[in-house]
Amino acid sequence: MKKISRRKFIQASALTGIVGGIAATGVYKVTEFSSNAEGRIVIIGGGAAGLSMAALLQRWLKKPNITIIDPSDKQFYQPGFTLVASGVYKPKDVWKQQEKCIPNKAKWIKDSVITLNPERKNIRTKNNGEIEYDFLVLTPGIQINWDLVEGITHRTLGEGNAHSIYDFEGAQKTWSAIQNFSKTGGKAIFTDTYTKHKCGGAPKKICLLTDDYMRKQKTRDSGVLDFYTVDPILYDVPHYTPRLEQIYEERNVDITLNTRVKGIDTKHKKVYLERNWSNNENDVTEIVEDYDFLHFTPPMSAPDFVKESGLSWQEGGLAAEGWVEVDKETLIHPRYPNIICLGDCAGIPTSKTSAAIRKQVPIAAKNLILTMENKEPTEKYNGYAACPIITDYGHVLLCEFDYNKNPQPSFPFSIMDMSKEQYAAWQLKTKVLKPLYFHGMINGYGF
């Protein structure tokens, strides 16, 4: 029998514990509660949050009446886009046909929402007219505003070697670009964006994966890698920040803070940036950088129909992009208690990740049913989110935290120092989370 090191044994044991713990938790969650509550439930959005809510509600309600409105043909595992863009996954690994993912007791209207009127409890769709509801689950996801970066559109993504993994085709193009850049060398620029966006760690991941891929190809010396962030710090969760900054320094990747992308000249391969050190709009320095390979993050917001519905925050830091106003603990709208919102569209001060949704779903489902029963919602969400920052092919810095940016380890990793990157977390990211998504989470298990 082949011997394994104590370190590998501990990590393998932790990984086994993750799978077992998730399975046990999922079974317990979906069998502990049932209700006779009735009402027309409409779910806008059939992504991670929408399908998971539908699946769990149909298990918990004895007489479910659930309609899902979503236009998509495919169900994407979006956290896998980074792994497509780095060659770990094949494109076919991260999607399934949507019709095979819709819960069997839910009605699917394959359409887009045009307007939403919470006063009339009414939704107008593009092709199916008006739909009324008693209770609304608002999970439409996020709107990517490619047009807010001058000089490039969704259609022209990839031209001038300017790429983004926030798109399925874009992730595939990014992988080709990384391989080519490793051969040619030059200057690579990676950026985030000034709005809240899906998985804030993704731009950091693809930067570090590009670096590691080049090292494995023995071509790293031929390239210069620079990372630009709009924030005054590389990462805003203190428990994990020191090691992440150290990794960038060790890899010789320069970090520029307080800087955002304004536009891209794909013909001449120039990126136009604005640096603002003081948060004063009059104290802005414009910068132009040449590049050979660019990965940028487009601005994002709530969908237009949400912004026009009156459900968004009207003031504060979450108002600018139209994020839905909800109680950050119960996830219920303060002015319309028959509306609950979770996922990327929710205006809550935490990261927009699949892991956050996984924790929000059982809380939102229970509180919605309590509302249907004319009871006060009692379940509370603590802001848990997780961002597995891939630092190289084989290690992940698993960042788990709450609203207060305190560490919130939910997996059996306490025997390791999770302020540093770990092999077991890489196994979790690449081997466990995708099956958990397709076979557990969107089927109402594994919360």
What do the predicted segments below correspond to?
Residues 30-107, 194-238:
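Beta1-alpha1 glycine-rich phosphate/pyrophosphate-binding loop at the start
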Residues 141-218:
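Glycine-rich dinucleotide-binding loop and its adjacent helix/turn
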Residues 345-375, 379-381:
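A conserved FAD-binding loop/helix module that cradles the flavin
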Residues 398-447:
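C-terminal auxiliary extensions adjacent to catalytic cores
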